[in-house]
């Protein structure tokens, strides 16, 4: 029996965009469950009892409750951690200096991650727009000339799809198989764009907190 005109609600649980991409082949523009894990010093893990999976940056760029708590405790002198531990675990700021230190450390860590990535967010945006406009093999083969920073990635895609021997000027349309590969490539770029945006939003968030806590100097 088939029922028509009924709304169907699908629930994918608390998957991040990377997990959705791996398991279902799509991502969400605004996924409240998306998150970014940043590398942490071993002492950060050992100085608190928060599980590793709770130490991340939210989709909106804000550090998780657990990550902030762990960083505040880690930034506290070891001889004071026991007395201030209950405040850190309750989500309270321990001091202005401590909070500024935590925000500076987090922003620097995010900035380092972004700098070590092979492409910039602006380059990914341009590449994504260009891929969406591709209609034939000539346009695809010309991409490597336009996007120097993504040349290796583009060449890898061309080689993986056995297109390296296609002559320029052939005006051949993309095969169904190549288009499917391009769709997957498109999704991969979308994912890394959102990954980078979370890191950038975290830097902005940390900068705002630092500005709000820093003493204001007014002209005489």
Label each region the model flagged:
Residues 1-7, 208, 215:
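Conserved AWS/pre-SET-to-SET junction and N-terminal core of the SET lysine methyltransferase domain
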Residues 2, 8-18:
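Short, charged beta-turn/beta-strand-edge "cap" motif at the junction between a beta-strand
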Residues 19, 24-220:
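Charged low-complexity "KEKE/polyampholyte" interaction tracts
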């Amino acid at each position: 029996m088939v029922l028509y005109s009924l709304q169907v609600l699908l629930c994918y649980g608390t998957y991040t965009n990377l997990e959705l991409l791996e398991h279902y082949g799509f991502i969400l523009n605004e996924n409240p469950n998306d998150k970014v894990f940043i590398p942490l010093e071993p002492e950060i893990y050992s100085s608190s009892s928060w599980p590793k999976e709770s130490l991340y940056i939210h989709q909106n760029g804000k550090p998780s409750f657990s990550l902030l708590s762990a960083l505040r405790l880690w930034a506290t002198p070891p001889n004071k951690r026991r007395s201030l531990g209950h405040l850190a675990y309750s989500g309270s700021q321990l001091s202005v200096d401590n909070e500024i230190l935590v925000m500076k450390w987090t922003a620097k860590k995010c900035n380092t991650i972004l700098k070590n990535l092979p492409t910039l967010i602006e380059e990914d945006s341009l590449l994504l727009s260009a891929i969406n406009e591709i209609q034939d093999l000539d346009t695809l083969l010309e991409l490597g000339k336009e996007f120097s920073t993504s040349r290796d990635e583009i060449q890898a895609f061309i080689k993986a799809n056995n297109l390296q021997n296609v002559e320029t000027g052939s005006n051949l349309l993309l095969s169904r198989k190549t288009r499917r590969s391009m769709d997957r490539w498109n999704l991969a770029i979308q994912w890394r764009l959102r990954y980078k945006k979370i890191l950038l939003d975290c830097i902005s968030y940390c900068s705002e907190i630092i500005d709000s806590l820093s003493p204001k100097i007014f002209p005489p």
